[in-house]
């Protein structure tokens, strides 16, 4: 059986990195299809592309795009149910897509894959499918994230916050906690991405505008150095299907503060400082501890470097291969 891979998801974002890492290890033929896989018209486009394939073929998508109708064996990755569980990240078309097309495909596809046990259980509950139809393949960390990379040296100490200005990234609470934390005022807070008026206005009102920086779009190759140079990663997200920044920071030897909700405690284990992401006071306390206690930072760094050994792309690819082999075997028997 020939399995075609939907490579259109490749990019610098989370799903894009998963796409590239699996492509390098699985070496599947790329599906002959163009267009944005997240487009509202893509279910039809993907359905038509699959109709053109020979019968003894299958399709694997590393993202959450699915065909209007499943006409060939199909496997895909649902990284999370963000658009269902976080209404501010959804709209009418996304709700229709998830509830009418994606949910049905969870029943019709050979298997749905996901990246954490949290997401797996959430998908099983939402789609109302048997447990065996959703497989947790985990996630990996690229070898470029390591403790011996050259750290970013801006001339001052900083806390690092990887985000995109979406509400579930919880950056307003991070900013408020940072402003209220009793720490060395020379320490700055650095965000990836561009500022928005809401955060800039909040920074001005909290009188920390000069202590907060936005890096704009950060090339992926620069991220390891930014992690490595930071006192800590501050990542108290309200919702994650996995949380790649947590393991990327750990791989660089950087201490992590993250949330005690969704997938994050599962990913971080005991190798991070866990806080209630809805509590500014807990985030503030975590920031104060990380900035004032070098022994805590050292301990979290060591634990993180051990923890991250669990997250290898080779392991993820092996789990995908197992599913592909099972699909081929069942297709032969049919």
Describe the role of every protein-language-model region:
Residues 1-334:
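Carbohydrate transferase catalytic cores enriched for Leloir-type hexosyltransferases
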């Amino acid at each position: 059986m020939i399995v075609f891979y939907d490579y259109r998801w490749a990019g610098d974002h989370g799903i894009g990195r998963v796409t590239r890492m699996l492509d390098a290890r699985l070496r599947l033929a790329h599906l002959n299809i163009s267009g944005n896989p997240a487009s509202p018209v893509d279910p039809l486009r993907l359905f038509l592309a699959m109709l053109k394939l020979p019968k003894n073929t299958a399709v694997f998508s590393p993202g959450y795009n699915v065909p209007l109708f499943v006409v060939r064996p199909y496997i895909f990755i649902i990284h999370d149910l963000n658009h269902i569980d976080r209404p501010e990240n959804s709209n009418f078309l996304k709700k229709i897509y998830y509830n009418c097309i994606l949910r049905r495909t969870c029943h019709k596809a050979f298997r749905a894959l996901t990246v954490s046990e949290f997401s797996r259980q959430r998908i099983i509950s939402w789609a109302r499918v048997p447990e065996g139809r959703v497989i947790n393949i985990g996630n990996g960390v690229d070898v470029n994230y390591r403790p011996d990379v050259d750290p970013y040296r801006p001339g001052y100490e900083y806390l690092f916050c990887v985000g995109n200005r979406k509400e579930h990234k919880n950056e307003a609470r991070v900013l408020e906690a940072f402003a209220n934390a009793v720490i060395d005022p020379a320490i700055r807070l650095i965000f990836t991405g561009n500022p928005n008026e809401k955060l800039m206005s909040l920074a001005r009102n909290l009188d920390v505008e000069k202590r907060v920086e936005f890096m704009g779009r950060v090339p992926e190759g620069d991220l390891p150095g930014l992690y490595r140079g930071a006192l800590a990663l501050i990542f108290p997200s309200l919702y994650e299907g996995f949380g790649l920044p947590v393991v990327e920071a750990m791989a660089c030897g950087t201490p992590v503060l993250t949330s005690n909700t969704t997938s994050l405690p599962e990913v971080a284990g005991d190798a991070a400082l866990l806080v209630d992401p809805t509590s500014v006071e807990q985030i503030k306390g975590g920031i104060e501890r990380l900035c004032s206690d070098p022994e805590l930072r050292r301990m979290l760094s060591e634990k993180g470097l051990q923890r991250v050994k669990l997250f290898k792309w080779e392991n993820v690819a092996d789990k995908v291969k197992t599913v592909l082999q099972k699909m081929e075997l069942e297709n032969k028997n049919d």
